[in-house]
Amino acid sequence: MLLFSLTAITAVLAVSAVPTPSNNKDGSTISELPENWDQTKDDNRSLFLNKSDKNDLEPYPLALSEEGNQDGYDQTVDQRFDSPQSNGELDNLIMRPELYGEPPAMEGLASAFDLQRRKRGSGTKVGGAGAATKVVTKSGSGKKNLKPEDQAALSPIDLMTQHEAQRRKRGSGTKVGGAAASAKTATKNSGGNKKNFRPISERRKRDSGLSAADVRALLNLWEAQERRKQEYANQFAADRYYGRVNPDEEQPEVDENGDLWYNEPVVIGPHDRDYPHHSYFSEQNRMALARGYPDLYQVGPNELAQRYEEARRKRQYANKMKRFMVAKKRSDNMMHQNNYRPRDDLYTLAELLRSAPRVQEQDIPVYRRLIL
């Protein structure tokens, strides 16, 4: 027993005497890392067994400092963002506040630009055949002789102000007639030939020989034409929705015999016999009748019945039994619950009445059944 105890103690002492494996040159342990140690720069002091493992964590230089040294990692982060002077190695260039400053004030730019423009336009060279005159004024009137590239640099407000000043100075007197009279003699200060000139506010761009009565007559004619256009437009819009309305055919409800006219048999004209009224083959005739023109296409009774039958077959069911079967299926509440809205019996009856064939008689009007 004593022999076993001595053997165990000897083994423990032998194990404790074995040096700790180290990957550093100076023999220090791995847990005791030197200060300012960077795993990305020194390959000899790397903790990775091979270089491939190190390359996998290359974008994360703080991976090791996060493990087991949370205080140091937080201190590094605080130092990176709060330090006024940084070495630049760990700066985040995307979130740097100096890269996202306020834009420069526009007032300063505008004043500098205006000052530069005034200096450039204070005196300019006036081109001529042999004379070079320099126009220098305190108010900057020399801007009227600016070069085209200088004028392009002016703002729109300055260009309009300059143009208005030139127009007023040039148009102080406008010549009306006479080849001998010169514009130089009609200035504000000189007496000038005032007969041949009038103020610019009274000049006319087009002088005509029309009298005042002629002008009024032309104005009345133009107003009547505009009113007529508006009446035609309104009448066409009403005819498009309500059919042709002729105000000349209006008559009182009670005639001279004392009878109500709508109780008597109605004789329909040849234009109103085409049915349906708003179909594709009667549209052109209705447009012509609304404007008072004769019928573009004369449609006979036989041709009219044939066209109506073709149109009815295209949009309605030809078989009566098939029509009722479809109506029965549509009225079933248990069918098509998800994608079909159930309809009541009144709606189905109205659909059947609308789709029923109707025959146009000679002098009996046919009324369309509208479902609201």
UniProtKB/Swiss-Prot annotation:
Major subcellular location class: cytoplasm
Basic and acidic residues: compositionally biased ranges: 38-57
Signal sequence bounds: 1-17
Organism annotation: Bombyx mori (Silk moth)
Protein name: Putative neuropeptide precursor protein
Biased composition range(s): Polar residues: 19-31, 72-89
Entry annotated with the keyword Glycosyltransferase: no
Subcellular location, record wording: Cytoplasm; Secreted
